[in-house]
């Protein structure tokens, strides 16, 4: 999980999800693309 000040989609399969006030990027096909903002 990468923690960044600005999260962007790396690949088209990425999904941007908001959980508990934080923005996450999740990708089932490429778990290494996981990101969290903050």
Swiss-Prot record:
Q: Could you tell me what this protein is called? A: Large ribosomal subunit protein bL36
> Quick one: which gene encodes this?
rpmJ
The record's section on PANTHER family has: 50S RIBOSOMAL PROTEIN L36 2, LARGE RIBOSOMAL SUBUNIT PROTEIN BL36B
The GO molecular function terms of this record are: structural constituent of ribosome
> What Pfam families does the record point to?
Ribosomal_L36
Question: Would you tell me the Gene Ontology cellular component terms?
Answer: ribonucleoprotein complex; ribosome
Example GO biological process term?
A: translation
- Keywords from the named record: Ribonucleoprotein, Ribosomal protein
What domain of life is recorded for the organism?
Answer: Bacteria
Q: Which NCBIfam families match?
A: rpmJ_bact (TIGR01022)
Origin organism of this chain? Prochlorococcus marinus (strain MIT 9312)
């Amino acid at each position: 999980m990468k923690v960044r000040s600005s999260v962007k989609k790396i690949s088209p399969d990425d999904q941007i999800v908001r959980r508990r006030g934080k923005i996450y990027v999740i990708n089932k096909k490429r778990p290494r693309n996981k990101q969290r903002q903050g």
